[in-house]
Each structure stands twice: as structure tokens, then as C-alpha cells.
Amino acid sequence: MNVFLWVVAVFLAFVFLSTGLLKLVRTKEQLAATGLGWVEDFGPGTIRLIGILEVLGALGLILPAVTGIAEVLVPVAAIGLALNMLGAMSVHIRRKEPTLVVMTGVLAFLCAFLAWGRLVLVPFS
């Protein structure tokens, strides 16, 4: 189970690091042009904040475990990212984007599973 939790953590870290960095380096218009229509509902500052939170969450999924420092931050980061994805789900529900509702729901589930796994199943010592 420990290996599986690591695989989930690395996958989620990759997803959130890449999407978070995109939100930080591209303008709102560039993001909208790539098909991220939800950005029209938010200001540039909010989009940047989401990007910052995703990058920090991605780092929080890996760095504490790798360094052995404050390992409790791994499930905390996972819970934060799960909450972020629940917010994203509500946006996609409102915008009637069922594919994105499912995708963000799967990410929220994986984040919650990782948090549960690291808090209950295989906690760090």
C-alpha cells in the first residue's frame, strides 16, 4: 500500500504542479484560448492564487515525505487540494461541463484517498 500511495502522490504532484504553473505563467486570455473556459468566471488575481495553491499543494505532497520534515503536511496538502477540486467541481457543474466535473471529481477522490492513506493506512513514522 505504501508504494501505491507514493504512486498516487507523484501522479497528483505532477498534475497539480503542471496545471498550477500554467496558471502562473499564462495570461487569462491564453488560458481561455487553450480551452479553459472557466477562467472567464474569475479575475486574473484569483487565477494566479489558484495556481499558487496548486503548486504549493503539489510540493506539499512530496517534499515533506522525501525530506522527513513535517510529514504531516502530506495529508494536509492532499486535503487542501481535494477541497480545491471540490470548488472546481462546483464551477464545472454550474458551467454544465460534465467531463470536467468527472475529471475534477476523480482528482478530489484521489486527493482524499491519499490523505486517508497517509493518516490511517500507512502513516509516516
Segments and roles (model prediction):
Residues 1-125:
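Membrane-interface extramembranous regions
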